[in-house]
C-alpha cells in the first residue's frame, strides 16, 4: 500500500505505477531531497513539533542514507513512486516509527518545490563555472591576437577589416551576459518554499526562516500557492540555457565556415573532427555541427515546459512532474556543450596569414576610402557614390583599391592625393577605429581589461 493509500480500497494498477513513476529523474535530486529533510527535521525538533529524540534519530538516519547515496550504495524502488517516498520508506526501515514523523507539517508539493529550487541553484553555479572557464580561454586567445587582421562581415560578405581579438571579444560579451543571466536565475531561485504545504501552508508552528538559514537560502517564499506551483526558476534556467546554446551555435557556425576550403581560417584538431566512410580526403567538423543541432534540442525543452505550465490552475498539478526531464535535459546538454566547446577551441589552430590575406581582398577598406574623401571636404553621400564607382572600376580592371594609380584615382575625383594609400592600408583601417568598442588594438586591449573585471565579479 502506498504511503498515501489510506483512502483507497486497492493499490494502483502496475501500468499506472510504471506510467506515473519519476524515480529516474528524481534520483538525481536525492541529495537535495535529503538535505532538505535534514533541515526540516532539525527545525521540527527545535520547535517541539516532534519529540527531540525522534528528531535526532531522523537526522542520524538521514545522514546515514545521504552517506550511502554519495557512495552509490542505494538502489531506488519504482514501487515507492518517487524519490521522496523512497527516502521516507528507507528511513522508516532503518530507524523505525520515528521515521514516520519526518513528514509532519510538510507536503510532497512543497518538498519537491524545495528540491527544485536547490537543484536550479546548484546547476546555475555549475554552468557559471563552465562559462567562466570558456571566457578565460577566449580572453587569453584574444590577448595573443590583438594585431591579427581579418575581414569583418555583414551578410557573410567582406565589410570592414577587424582583428581576430575583436571578433573573439564579441563572444566574450555574449558569454558574460549568459553568466549574468544564470546568476540572476540563481537569485530568483533563492527563496525557500518549504512550509507552503500542499497549497495553503500548515497549522504547525514551523520556523521557515530557520529552515532557510540551515539550507543557505536568503529568503522564504511569501505565498504558499505560488510557492508550490511556480516553476519559473526552471524556465529561467532553460531560457538562459537557450540563449547560451544560441551563442555557442553561432560560434560553431563560424568555425564550420572557417574550417572550410573556401575560408581556411582555422584548422580543427583531428580529435574534434571525423572522416567520411567513402571520401578519404574528408575532415569534417562534426562536433561543431552537432552542437548547432543540440541547440534546437534545448529550445525544445523551453517550449515543452512553457507548454506544460501555460494552462495550469493554481496550485499543484501532476503535469508539473514533466518539469525535471526538461530541466535536466537542458542543463546536461548545455554543460556538456560548454565542456566540449572549450576543449575544441583550445585545440584549434588559427591560420593568421590566411586571415590577413582575406582581409586585403573584397574591398573591406572601401569605407575608409570614402572617409578619406570626407576628410578632404567631400560630402559623405558623394564620397560613398565615388568609391562605389571606384569599386566597380576595380572589378572590371581586375584590381584592388591599393593597386590603382594616382591618375586612376583622380579620374574619379580630384580630391584624391598620394596619401590615399596610407589611409586605406589594413593597419590604418583597423587602427583608426580606436573609440571604445572598436577593433583598434588599444581599444580591444581596454575591452579585455574591462571583461576581466566583469569576469572576476561573476
Positions of predicted regions on the chain:
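Short, well-ordered beta-strand elements within core beta-sheets of diverse protein domains
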Residues: 40-50, 163-166, 235-243, 368-377
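Charged, flexible cofactor/metal-binding loops and thiol motifs
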Residues: 117-128, 143, 151, 157-311, ...
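Short alpha-helical "patches" and their helix-cap loops
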Residues: 53-58, 133-137, 182, 258-262, ...
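Conserved hydrophobic residue
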Residues: 49-50, 74, 263-264, 379, ...
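Glycine-rich cofactor/substrate-binding loops
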Residues: 1-36, 97-98, 279-458
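Hydrophobic residues in alpha-helical segments
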Residues: 45, 69, 142, 251, ...
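Short alpha-helical scaffolding segments that buttress acidic/His motifs in well-ordered protein cores
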Residues: 41, 62, 138, 241, ...
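A helix-coil-helix interface module used to build multimeric assemblies
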Residues: 1-201, 206-213, 274-275, 286, ...
Amino acid at each position: 500500500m502506498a504511503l498515501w493509500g489510506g483512502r483507497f480500497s486497492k493499490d494502483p494498477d502496475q501500468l499506472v505505477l510504471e506510467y506515473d513513476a519519476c524515480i529516474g529523474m528524481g534520483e538525481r535530486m536525492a541529495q537535495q531531497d535529503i538535505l532538505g529533510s535534514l533541515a526540516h527535521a532539525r527545525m521540527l525538533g527545535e520547535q517541539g513539533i516532534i519529540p527531540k529524540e525522534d528528531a535526532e534519530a531522523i537526522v542520524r538516519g538521514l545522514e546515514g542514507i545521504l552517506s550511502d547515496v554519495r557512495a552509490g550504495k542505494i538502489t531506488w524502488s519504482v514501487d515507492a513512486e518517487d524519490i521522496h517516498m523512497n527516502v521516507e520508506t528507507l528511513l522508516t526501515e532503518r530507524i523505525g516509527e520515528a521515521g514516520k514523523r519526518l513528514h509532519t507539517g510538510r507536503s510532497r508539493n512543497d518538498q519537491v518545490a524545495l528540491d527544485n529550487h536547490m537543484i536550479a541553484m546548484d546547476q546555475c553555479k555549475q554552468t557559471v563555472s563552465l562559462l567562466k572557464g570558456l571566457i578565460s580561454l577566449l580572453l587569453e586567445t584574444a590577448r595573443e591576437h590583438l594585431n591579427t587582421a581579418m575581414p569583418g562581415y555583414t551578410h557573410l560578405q567582406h565589410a570592414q577589416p577587424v582583428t581576430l581579438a575583436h571578433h573573439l571579444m564579441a563572444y566574450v560579451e555574449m558569454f558574460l551576459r549568459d553568466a549574468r543571466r544564470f546568476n540572476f536565475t540563481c537569485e530568483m531561485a533563492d527563496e525557500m518554499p518549504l512550509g507552503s504545504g500542499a497549497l495553503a501552508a500548515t497549522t504547525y508552528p514551523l520556523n521557515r526562516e530557520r529552515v532557510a538559514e540551515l539550507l543557505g537560502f536568503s529568503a522564504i517564499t511569501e505565498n504558499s500557492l505560488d510557492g508550490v506551483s511556480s516553476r519559473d526558476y526552471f524556465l529561467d534556467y532553460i531560457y538562459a540555457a537557450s540563449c547560451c546554446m544560441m551563442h555557442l551555435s553561432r560560434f560553431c557556425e563560424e568555425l564550420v565556415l572557417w574550417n572550410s576550403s573556401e575560408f581556411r581560417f582555422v584548422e580543427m584538431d583531428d580529435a574534434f573532427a571525423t572522416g567520411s566512410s567513402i571520401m578519404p580526403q574528408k575532415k569534417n567538423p562534426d562536433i561543431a555541427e552537432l552542437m548547432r543541432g543540440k541547440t534546437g534540442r534545448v529550445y525544445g525543452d523551453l517550449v515543452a515546459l512553457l507548454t506544460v505550465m501555460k494552462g495550469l490552475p493554481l496550485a499543484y498539478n501532476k503535469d508539473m512532474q514533466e518539469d525535471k526531464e526538461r530541466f535536466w535535459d537542458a542543463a546536461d546538454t548545455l554543460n556538456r556543450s560548454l565542456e566540449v566547446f572549450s576543449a575544441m577551441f583550445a585545440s584549434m589552430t588559427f591560420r593568421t596569414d590566411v586571415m590577413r590575406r582575406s582581409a586585403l581582398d573584397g574591398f573591406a577598406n572601401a569605407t575608409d576610402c570614402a572617409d578619406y574623401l570626407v576628410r578632404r571636404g567631400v560630402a559623405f553621400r558623394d564620397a560613398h557614390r565615388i568609391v562605389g564607382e571606384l569599386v566597380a572600376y576595380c572589378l572590371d580592371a581586375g584590381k584592388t583599391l591599393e593597386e590603382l594609380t594616382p591618375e586612376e584615382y583622380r579620374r574619379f575625383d580630384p580630391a584624391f592625393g598620394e596619401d590615399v594609400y596610407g589611409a586605406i592600408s589594413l593597419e590604418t583601417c583597423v587602427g583608426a577605429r580606436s573609440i571604445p568598442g572598436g577593433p583598434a588594438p588599444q581599444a580591444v586591449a581596454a575591452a579585455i581589461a574591462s571583461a576581466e573585471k566583469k569576469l572576476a565579479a561573476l
